């Protein structure tokens, strides 16, 4: 519950912070930051050495393992920070951005704080003190947001975003170590860490594939279209990605935990129902936001962000479909078939880079449409390819998503009719959004009433269930027999 509440607050904080920072900075500064951040983010994928995902399974009495992990992470963090800062020199020269080196150097310090957080975070997870980690995360994000706004207000530009990134990881590291620091012994054994490194390697490979692709994307867009368009592209991409993935994180975690311990037939049912619930929440929000993008950008961000509109209209619905289709990934992780997810992500990253490359002939709008097409192919792959392993077949999932998708399209149409009739001022925009939500609700009741009742019943059972280590035995409504 604590993690879910913190996740919700962070989403709200990001949604409030995005327009404020966009107003204060503008596309040029966001474009410069977009060149710097993927470099550090890519290297950051190595910062926990694969230990973050597995160290919590180790008994705290195993001092050799915990001490070895601490020293390995310290060495890794310092080494990666130096390598990142050095690479910043090369990237700054290639991108012809003299400020880029300093910003990457500041961001590189966060790598040390990331590694300092891994061991105490694992100890807290093992002790099931997840609330402490959630509180530290929330505190760090609030302080980071305040510092970013203050610096941006004083004209610090892209430095304010870099400072926010660094402060978040620094505050989080300090708070986690205050809660669970244990002085390591002066011992080290690589053999003691071997199985932890092997287990975490697959997830690191997936993250590297994704971030490397985005780094190449940003570099190509900067070279072909300039920093201003890169800033708008990155902002639209970031808003869409953060909003949709943040909404899906809790569902991802629930599927992973249940797949580790639950019966496979029940996991199939849970996957189908949670995908539907995610679609019910995301489809109207993203479709309406895409329809209202011209008014939202004009009213909240101003004319200098006018190029952002098209990116939001494409990326918001696309990412909504993507996060729903990716809910097979936690089941693959639990079943030991993460390799399927890796190859799908690798194909997506390669396809996105090729789509951006076509922008040389098609323009940036054509490249963005190509990215959307590649992402939809990825969605189909994530539904089809894992089906034999997970038992989660495509047609039942699509049947559950049809109602929310159709209703979301009708809601968007309702919004557009209201705005076209009454104008594009803020009153008409609010009326259009309200009308769209009403249209969505009525459409769902008309075409999907029975499923809505079952969704409510299942959601109420999951939420009201007391905390337990035992998996839920059935995810069907209590008044009907289990069926796929």
Label the predicted regions.
Residues 1-49, 76-88, 140-149, 164-172, ...:
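Signature of the first transmembrane helix
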Residues 12, 71-96, 101-106, 146-154, ...:
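Alpha-helical transmembrane segments of multi-pass membrane transport and lipid-handling proteins
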Residues 14, 44-63, 125-126, 236, ...:
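Helix-loop junctions and terminal segments of transmembrane helices
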Residues 15-29, 92-93, 150-152, 211-242, ...:
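Helix-terminus/linker motif at the lipid-water interface of multi-pass membrane proteins
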Residues 54-63, 112-136, 159, 180, ...:
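Membrane-interface junctions at transmembrane-helix termini in multi-pass inner-membrane proteins
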Residues 101-108, 136-182, 198-201, 235-237, ...:
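Hydrophobic alpha-helical transmembrane segments
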Residues 131, 135, 174-215, 254-269, ...:
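Interhelical loop/hinge segments that connect adjacent transmembrane helices in multipass membrane
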Residues 384-387, 392, 413-484:
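Membrane-proximal transmembrane or re-entrant/amphipathic helices at the cytosolic face
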